[in-house]
Amino acid sequence: VPDSVEEQIELAFRRLGAVLVHEGLGFEDLVELVSYHVRIDEQLGAFREIKARCITREFPAWTILGVASLARPNLLVEIKAVAAAWVHGGRDADCIAR
């Protein structure tokens, strides 16, 4: 894990992007984002900047939480994300299309 908060944020978004791609999704499919920050005042600007590069829409909903610590002492930021995949066809297609 990198020491700088900027590098940790970049790494978190790269890993999130990789998970999304693996599932056939992208950042545009996110519906909820929760970020946890140690020393939130020191890192919020960098987080917003990096987030804006990855997520270019107004969505997803974003909750920002300041925390005393994370799972390991050197972790400064953590991201929880929820994405939604659109289902095309199948038995629910009529309900979705109406």
Predicted segments with their positions:
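Short, polar/acidic, helix-capping and beta-turn segments at strand->helix junctions
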Residues: 1-98
